[in-house]
């Protein structure tokens, strides 16, 4: 498979994010949001609210982290905050999903996007901490 074919396979896989219905209602209350909408809104929040971060952050990098963080839901599903059973194997499901989905990309891009996901999950950098802060804010 050519580099372009690998990239397009990944892009087509991302379309599945539109089918994952989350527990969170959109503000109007008319329906629940999907994961693609959730990720897009977080990406915008990364830029718009970055001046309020506790420490300086690279907003573009934060956007990468939040855009990558829920890609694993394509395989692992959205584990709801109150789903105790779902949390039992959440890490294993998400690791396997990350391996498969990011693995659709050419090796260099797979490693880069996987590093964004890993950074988000680790919550160690200023950008990852801010990403988690806006993730908490989106549910208010």
Can you name each region flagged by the protein language model?
Residues 13-41, 81:
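Active-site flanking loop/helix segments enriched in acidic
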Residues 10-16, 41, 64, 70, ...:
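Residue-level recognition of specific faces of alpha-helices
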Residues 68-120, 127, 133:
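Divalent metal-dependent catalytic cores for phosphoryl transfer on phosphate-bearing substrates
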Residues 44-50, 60-79:
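Active-site alpha-helical segments that house and flank conserved acidic catalytic motifs
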């Amino acid at each position: 498979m050519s580099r372009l074919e690998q990239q397009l396979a990944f892009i087509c896989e991302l379309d599945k994010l539109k089918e994952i219905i989350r527990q969170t209602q959109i503000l109007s209350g008319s329906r629940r949001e999907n994961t693609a909408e959730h990720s897009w809104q977080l990406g915008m929040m990364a830029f718009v609210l970055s001046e309020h971060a506790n420490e300086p952050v690279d907003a573009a990098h934060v956007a990468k982290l939040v855009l990558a963080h829920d890609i694993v839901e394509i395989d692992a599903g959205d584990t709801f905050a109150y789903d105790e059973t779902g949390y039992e194997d959440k890490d294993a499901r998400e690791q396997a999903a990350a391996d498969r989905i990011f693995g659709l990309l050419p090796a260099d891009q797979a490693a880069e996007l996987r590093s964004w996901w890993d950074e988000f999950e680790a919550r160690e950098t200023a950008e990852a901490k801010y990403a988690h802060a806006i993730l908490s804010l989106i549910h208010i």
